Amino acid sequence: MAQDLSEKELLRMEVEQLKKEVKNPRDLISKTGKEIKDYVEAQAGTDPLLKGIPEDKNPFKEKGTCVLS
């Protein structure tokens, strides 16, 4: 699609997108960083990547062995 548009049309689309983006509310990283850190620390107890998965609920655990004779 972009190949069919002229450079002027592409620049107009980019300006339209930038006008939309400039309206987005922005917060200071000092505020949002603390919020993210607090959230991660609060969720750490239930995070399976940190805590691990119980053996009985592990979907990747070997079900058993198969013996072919």
Swiss-Prot record:
User: Sorted alphabetically, which keywords does the UniProt record give?
Assistant: Cell membrane, Lipoprotein, Membrane, Methylation, Prenylation, Transducer
Q: How does it sit in the membrane?
A: Lipid-anchor
S-farnesyl cysteine-type lipidated residues: C66
- Propeptide residue interval(s): 67-69
Residue(s) carrying Cysteine methyl ester: C66
GO BP: G protein-coupled receptor signaling pathway
Q: Which SUPFAM superfamilies match?
A: Transducin (heterotrimeric G protein), gamma chain (SSF48670)
- Kindly give the InterPro entries that the UniProt entry links to this protein: G-protein_gamma-like_dom, GGL_sf, Gprotein-gamma
* GO annotations of cellular component type: heterotrimeric G-protein complex
* Protein's cellular compartments: Cell membrane
**Alphabetized CDD domains for the sequence:** GGL (cd00068)
A GO molecular-function descriptor:
G-protein beta-subunit binding
SMART domains noted in UniProt: G_gamma, GGL
**Which coarse location class applies to the principal site listed for this UniProt protein?**
membrane
Note the Pfam families from the entry: G-gamma
Q: What does this protein do?
A: Guanine nucleotide-binding proteins (G proteins) are involved as a modulator or transducer in various transmembrane signaling systems. The beta and gamma chains are required for the GTPase activity, for replacement of GDP by GTP, and for G protein-effector interaction.
State the oligomer form and interacting partners: G proteins are composed of 3 units, alpha, beta and gamma.
The family line of this record is: Belongs to the G protein gamma family.
Q: What is this protein called?
A: Guanine nucleotide-binding protein G(I)/G(S)/G(O) subunit gamma-T2
Q: Which organism is it from?
A: Mus musculus
